């Protein structure tokens, strides 16, 4: 019998991780409900019921959950991958934005098919991820500072480029809007992601495409890279101790850069699949897109586990879709606050992991003393 099998169930890292995430979600939901009671006591039960039931109320709503979960999953994978290698990729939003721009550039300006546009999104995100990696590896500049700066640089650069590329905007394709990109169903239907084999199951919902399949494949691929390859071992070794990794002959500078490049590519794919769905257009923004930041609680809730990221992103997407059904009993601002509270508390998985571990260790110590 292996050591893993001899280990008590509640002391296994995987079990503790799952329990920590579930406990965090429960605490977040409870505090969210308390907040609803404080704001509008009479509608609190109905509001929470709407939040928890809407996602399964119809196949169209479930399709929307999957649609929103796909880019969220990619951003969660991006942040989690960097976490695993000892880096904090707070620049996922900028990489997401550049991925969206590169993919739309290929779709609208160059009239390329969806799979090329998707690859372009990965390239755009990777390019925007390489800068924080280089500054960290060769100048020891904190990647958080660099990444935040590049979030804003990326947003304003995309705005500048789009404003000077009339053919990219909706106004260049017969629409009156000049503050957003052209609709793909008009500019290049071939760049829209295929509906996939399950579209009929969802009643041909406009939200359904192959993006959720693509993201699950990437989650599995990232897990394999981190857990089953020498390259993944080297990346994690650099994350645990850069000096020890160098002593062992691992090129830590190269791995830091590669980690941020891969992390950026994952965020870039997230931006690509969101806009290549064909259901929305990129609007010239005045503030940083929130999707990249939403990847942080996804990664924390999943404890940076790529497989856990699948379920964490689905949960957060489900809560967001359900929150929209709480109107008119609650204002949109109130709903955003409640969702933020739930997501923030759900991200306390690491804290809950420590609490569970201490509780189990204390119980084991008492049993040993009794014997």
Residue ranges and their predicted role:
Residues 1-25, 240, 247, 251-254, ...:
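Cytosolic-side transmembrane-helix boundaries in multi-pass membrane proteins
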Residues 2-74:
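Membrane-interfacial amphipathic/re-entrant helices at transmembrane-helix boundaries
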Residues 7-19, 83-91, 110, 119-188, ...:
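Short loop segments and helix-boundary regions at transmembrane helix junctions
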Residues 20-37, 72-79, 100, 104-106, ...:
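Hydrophobic core segments of alpha-helical transmembrane domains in multi-pass membrane transport
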Residues 36-40, 53-109, 122, 126-141, ...:
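Single transmembrane alpha-helix segments in multi-pass membrane proteins
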Residues 54, 59, 151-226, 367-370:
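Transmembrane helix-bundle core of multi-pass membrane transporters
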Residues 127, 188, 194, 202-281, ...:
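Helix-loop-helix "hairpin" substructures at the membrane interface of multi-pass membrane proteins
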Residues 261-267, 271-340:
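Transmembrane alpha-helical segments in multi-pass inner-membrane proteins
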């Amino acid at each position: 019998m292996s050591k893993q099998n001899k280990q008590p169930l509640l002391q296994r890292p995987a079990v503790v991780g799952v329990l920590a995430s579930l406990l965090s979600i429960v605490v977040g939901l409870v505090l969210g409900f308390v907040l609803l009671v404080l704001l509008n006591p009479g509608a609190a039960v109905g509001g929470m019921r709407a939040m928890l039931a809407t996602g399964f109320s119809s196949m169209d709503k479930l399709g929307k959950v999957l649609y929103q979960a796909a880019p969220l999953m990619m951003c969660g994978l991006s942040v989690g991958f960097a976490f695993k290698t000892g880096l904090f990729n707070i620049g996922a939003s900028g990489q997401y934005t550049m991925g969206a721009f590169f993919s739309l550039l290929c779709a609208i300006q160059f009239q390329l098919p969806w799979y090329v546009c998707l690859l372009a999104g990965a390239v755009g995100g990777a390019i925007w991820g390489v800068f924080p990696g280089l500054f960290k590896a060769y100048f020891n500049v904190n990647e958080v500072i660099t990444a935040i700066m590049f979030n804003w640089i990326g947003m304003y650069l995309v705005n500048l480029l789009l404003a000077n590329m009339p053919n990219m905007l909706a106004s260049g394709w017969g629409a009156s809007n000049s503050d957003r990109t052209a609709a793909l169903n008009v500019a290049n239907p071939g760049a829209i992601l295929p509906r996939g084999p399950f579209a009929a199951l969802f009643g041909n919902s406009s939200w359904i495409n192959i993006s959720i399949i693509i993201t699950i494949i990437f989650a599995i691929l990232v897990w394999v890279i981190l857990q089953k390859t020498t390259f993944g071992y080297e990346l994690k070794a650099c994350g645990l101790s850069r000096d020890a990794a160098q002593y062992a002959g691992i090129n830590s500078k190269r791995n830091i850069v590669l980690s941020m490049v891969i992390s950026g590519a994952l965020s870039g794919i997230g931006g690509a699949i969101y806009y290549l769905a064909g259901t929305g257009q990129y609007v010239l923004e005045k503030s940083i897109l929130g999707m990249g930041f939403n990847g942080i609680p996804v990664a924390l809730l999943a404890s940076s586990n790529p497989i856990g990221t699948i379920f964490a992103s689905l949960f957060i997407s489900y809560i967001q879709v359900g929150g929209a059904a709480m109107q008119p009993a609650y204002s949109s601002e109130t709903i955003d606050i409640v969702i933020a509270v739930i997501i923030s508390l759900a991200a306390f998985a690491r804290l809950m992991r420590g609490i569970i571990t201490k509780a189990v260790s204390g119980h084991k110590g008492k049993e040993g003393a009794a014997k």
